[in-house]
């Protein structure tokens, strides 16, 4: 807890939720195909009202001031983009939420993007729940850039510290994480 008070800060509250509800030790295969003894599934936190509120306020502080939308790859980013857009509205800031599909819609317009689409050239911040190698985030970034949007930043809840930052930098992206995996793992009793 913070030294000045016995009441945990929002950052400490969120760290506690992630450590107790999202983090597991064991033998896991990640979405990247890699094996790991650490697993982080943020959905038990991001799909709870109070957890999403904590995440959204924290992520909003890292969305570029001139961004007009936040976007992310479905499914992990779905609650994040909606929550951050709502947190922005609470501060009288217009910020739309976009969902990037994993593949083009098979019917209707065949759209990759869902939501109120801004004008081409608009700055969009990409949101992610967990970054490992950066593959999911980069897929979202490429779809947005192909649609004519400017993307320079990815904000994630957790950076697993497995090369995602280097992959982002190679694509001229800044990666900002609310937490590093090492910070969450250190918070959990052995």
Swiss-Prot record:
Required cofactor names: Mg(2+)
HAMAP family in alphabetical order: PyrE
Top-level taxonomy: Bacteria, Bacillati, Cyanobacteriota, Cyanophyceae, Synechococcales
The encoding gene: pyrE
Subunit structure: Homodimer.
Entry keyword annotation includes Transferase: yes
Listed EC numbers: 2.4.2.10
An example Gene Ontology molecular-function term: magnesium ion binding
Methyltransferase as UniProt keyword: no
Organism: Synechococcus sp. (strain CC9605)
GO biological process, any: 'de novo' UMP biosynthetic process
Pathway listed: Pyrimidine metabolism; UMP biosynthesis via de novo pathway; UMP from orotate: step 1/2
Residues given in the record as orotate binding sites: 132, 160
Top EC class, one word: transferase
Intrachain S-S bonds: none
Annotated family: Belongs to the purine/pyrimidine phosphoribosyltransferase family. PyrE subfamily.
Protein name, UniProt field: Orotate phosphoribosyltransferase
Biological role stated in the UniProt entry: Catalyzes the transfer of a ribosyl phosphate group from 5-phosphoribose 1-diphosphate to orotate, leading to the formation of orotidine monophosphate (OMP).
Protein origin, superkingdom: Bacteria
Catalytic activity: orotidine 5'-phosphate + diphosphate = orotate + 5-phospho-alpha-D-ribose 1-diphosphate
Keywords: Glycosyltransferase, Magnesium, Pyrimidine biosynthesis, Transferase
Chain sites annotated for binding 5-phospho-alpha-D-ribose 1-diphosphate: 101-102, 105, 107, 128-136
